[in-house]
Amino acid sequence: YYRLDLRKVFFNSHLGYERRRVALKVKSRERVLIPFCGVGPYVVPVAAAGARVVAIESNSEACKWMTDNARLNRVEDNIDLIKGDALVVADLLNIRYPKFDRAIIPTPYGMDRVLDIFSHLVKKGGAIHFYTFKKKHQIEGLIEKYENAGLEVEFYRSCGNVAPGVCRWVFDLVKG
């Protein structure tokens, strides 16, 4: 269950299947990083699966709703919410937290550079679920780029159109 005010925060109701798909892969006691967490649509089901989640969000209103949603779903004890810019906070995570077992990165449009930043926080053999916005003809090049960066592409799929010819894509990656 989620509460939110769509006048103040972003929420995509069309990604319900995708959020369930990823949450089902999470094992109890995993350490999961979720930057750009919003009101908690990935955080809450992952925490409910027994994972320990570090969530990062810069929007104060989204943080308020994420906290409320964690309480509403009784998973607040499994979540560390950090209010701040995910790109700034990333440098500090190496100091405070050991490497993560998994990262779920619902990347904002045009911010693909964050994959390199957050993949360094995931342990070798760890999973990364990376979301990006691309045209279909760009996908083969991305797969090659990810694999050259030491990220094995286990799975990828389109998660729906966002503009003419542009889709949101998810890549399930394993850090080598």
Please give the residue ranges for each predicted region.
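Rossmann-like S-adenosyl-L-methionine
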Residues: 1-176
